[in-house]
Regions:
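Short beta-strand element of the alpha/beta-hydrolase
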Residues: 67-76
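C-terminal catalytic histidine-bearing segment of alpha/beta-hydrolase fold enzymes
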Residues: 245-298
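Short beta-strand/loop motif that positions the catalytic acidic residue
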Residues: 234-236, 240
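Bacterial Sec-dependent N-terminal signal peptides
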Residues: 1-23
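Primarily recognizes the serine-hydrolase "nucleophile elbow" in alpha/beta-hydrolase
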Residues: 128-198, 216
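Mobile cap/lid helix-loop segments that gate and shape the active-site cleft of serine hydrolases
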Residues: 43, 189-224
Length: 298
């Protein structure tokens, strides 16, 4: 166990010194709630299927960067795949250009064959990612109070879940590290698990087709907002025919009802998947404008 811990630490040090992209396993030892299984993960040009061994790809900006902000990025994929290429790595590189440290999370996909409780496995991974970044903030030149989370589509649901369920630790956290993201940036997110709002595939993959009303309520993040929910940036296209814009609208309303700082940018056209749609090509500029207003970038 000591050897495993040392190797994990060594990976951190090498990553920090090199200032370059490095992939590390998300957990030092056992993965929480993991069932014994054959690893069937498949990579199709950055779109991952059957993910059961989560990892974190670390993108650090130039070491002389004055910006001390970090973002954990949760790609989308309907909790069926992880679209890490255009909703992860490409975004991380853009964050680096602004001096922001970025961490692309390849989280576990809910699967009864690999997880004891598949509904919490992605949340465990998101909490662990926040903990890893915060525990190593000094080493990586990050302000521990400027660690946010960003998510796309179902990854937006995961990010919003991390931002509304942080008071309960679903992972081992002996150090008592805060699992609360300091801000959220949600891009065409799935927010709700309620039948009239949700993306059916995301709901069924995460919670199952016969989820109880209590479970649907728990993972409907518009119903979990409190005064302590982090400040939030939302963006969505009104013609999104995959994830209804009502998800973002309801979350924005819930945030404002609790006096949480929130900014929402809507596009009349853009469909689902901004990184591939020229109609909504300014969305990332809106993100950085908001980050500047929040004093997260220069």
């Amino acid at each position: 166990m000591k050897i495993i811990g040392f190797l994990f630490y060594l990976l951190f040090v090498l990553c920090f010194c090199a200032g370059a992209q490095t992939v590390i396993p998300l957990y030092e030892g056992a993965i929480p709630g993991e069932k014994q299984h054959e690893n069937k993960e498949y990579d199709d040009n950055g779109i991952y299927s059957f993910v059961s061994k989560p990892d974190l790809t670390i993108y650090l900006p130039e070491v002389d960067s004055k910006v001390k902000t970090a973002v954990v990025i949760c790609p989308g994929g309907g909790y069926h795949v992880v679209c890490a290429s255009y909703e992860g790595h490409k975004i991380a590189k853009e964050m680096n250009k602004k001096g922001v440290a970025a961490f692309v999370l390849k989280y576990r996909l809910p699967n009864d064959n690999t997880c004891e409780n598949k509904s919490i496995a992605p949340l465990q991974d998101a909490q662990r990612a926040i903990k890893v970044v915060r525990d190593n903030a000094e080493k990586w030149g990050i302000d521990p109070n400027q660690i946010g989370i960003m998510g796309f589509s179902a990854g937006g649901h995961l990010a919003a879940t991390a931002g509304t369920h942080f008071s309960k630790s679903y992972i081992e956290n002996k150090e008592g590290t805060s699992l609360r993201p300091d801000f959220m940036m949600l891009v065409y997110p799935v927010i709700s698990m309620q039948p009239e709002l949700t993306h059916g595939g995301s709901r069924d993959n995460l919670l199952g087709k016969n989820a109880s009303s209590e479970l649907l309520e728990l993972f409907s993040n518009e119903k979990q907002v409190t005064e302590k929910t982090p400040r939030t940036f939302l963006t969505h296209a009104q013609d999104d025919d995959v994830v209804s814009v009502e998800n973002s609208l309801r979350f924005y309303e819930a945030l404002k009802a609790k006096n949480v700082s929130a900014d929402m940018h809507l596009f009349s056209k853009g469909k689902h998947g901004y990184p591939l749609e020229p109609a909504a090509s300014n969305w990332l500029g809106d993100v950085f404008k908001w980050m500047k207003e929040q004093e997260l970038v220069d």
